[in-house]
């Protein structure tokens, strides 16, 4: 499609390819996290520089944006959502919640703009977003201080997990 794209390959227990799908727009789209969902599909999360183009049907807000794509058990897109502010927003972790929605964890350099309701306090702050089962934002929260704070699945500072 464009630069980098999401590439998903489903394999069986013997390593045989069952299906594969490339999803992206006309610029760079980088997949950083995925999880099987309770309905047997998958939720894909990453960051995108693409505007509406190719498979991407959501606008960009400026710089990198969170890009969430829900696919079914055969790899077909069910829905997608792009969210962010006017600067750089990088999605690093996604977990399904007990209500069928998702909690997203990443970091942001965006001030109030687009989907961001709070200013960035440092260079990058944690940006936590709760979405419902169809990808609609329910709430979002910026957590940070006057330093760089990064959120990703392997971080010892902040892990996005459900307890």
Which stretches of residues belong to each language-model region?
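A sequence-level/structural motif corresponding to short, flexible coil/turn segments enriched
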Residues: 1-163
């Amino acid at each position: 499609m464009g630069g980098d794209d999401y590439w998903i390959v489903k394999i069986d227990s013997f390593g045989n390819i069952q299906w594969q799908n490339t999803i992206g727009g006309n610029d760079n789209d980088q997949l950083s996290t995925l999880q099987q969902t309770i309905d047997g599909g998958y939720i894909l999360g990453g960051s995108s520089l693409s505007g509406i183009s190719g498979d991407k049907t959501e606008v960009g807000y400026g710089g990198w944006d969170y890009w969430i794509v829900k696919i079914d058990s055969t790899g077909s897109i069910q829905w997608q959502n792009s969210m962010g502010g006017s600067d750089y927003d990088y999605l690093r972790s996604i977990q399904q919640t007990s209500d069928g929605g998702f909690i997203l964890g990443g970091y942001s350099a965006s001030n109030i703009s687009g989907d961001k309701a709070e200013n960035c306090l440092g260079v990058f702050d944690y940006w936590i977003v709760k979405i419902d089962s169809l990808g609609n934002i329910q709430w979002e929260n910026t957590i940070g201080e006057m330093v760089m704070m990064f959120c990703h699945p392997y971080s010892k500072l902040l892990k996005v997990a459900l307890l």
